């Protein structure tokens, strides 16, 4: 974990500090902008899983739901333990491509399950969650803190969380909750999930391609 020294003692905490907004100065770097854009794009399908997966699994009568989520939690713990080793042995770009590839795999599985009705695809999509979360959110936090100057490291991590859990979540709810799902509602309690999952798959593929083509690891950033 990178060193993230706190603000000076007795310095008042502001809203900008809490949301990591002081790290916006880092956006002057083109590669940091690209990373932010890819993260935001990836958050739309990732937060879609967080918000609506339980609704989907309930509608399709997925059995052993609690046990499956417990397996997903165990897998997440395993992937999180592997993350520091990955950072030691691999470049950030390679690690991020693995995470985005896992996001693509998830929505390929969900799309296949929605089309075929084979619930084993849903199981695979759930178990991969730890790898996606560990890399695409936690991994980007660590990388952003490594790039930032010491006085902005905690701000950089806060910025990543605001972008992912805040802005990304709002965009996901706006797209799927207010636009896509209502269009594919087949009854009061049922939806046709095929197109929403194909849209998520397409967004994940786009995020992966953009990152692979555009991102080059920047040198250490400063706030000047």
Predicted regions and their residues:
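Intracellular juxtamembrane helix-capping segments at the cytosolic ends
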Residues: 135-149
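Helix-loop boundary and gating motifs at the non-cytosolic
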Residues: 31-60, 64-70
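Multi-pass alpha-helical transporter architecture, strongest
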Residues: 1-2, 198-224
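Helix-to-loop junctions at the C-terminal end of transmembrane segments
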Residues: 79-92, 180-181
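C-terminal ends and interior cores of transmembrane alpha-helices
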Residues: 102-116
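Juxtamembrane intracellular "pre-TM" segments in multi-pass secondary transporters
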Residues: 2-36
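A membrane-interface helix-boundary motif in multi-pass transporters
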Residues: 178-206
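A late C-terminal transmembrane helix in Major Facilitator Superfamily
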Residues: 151-184
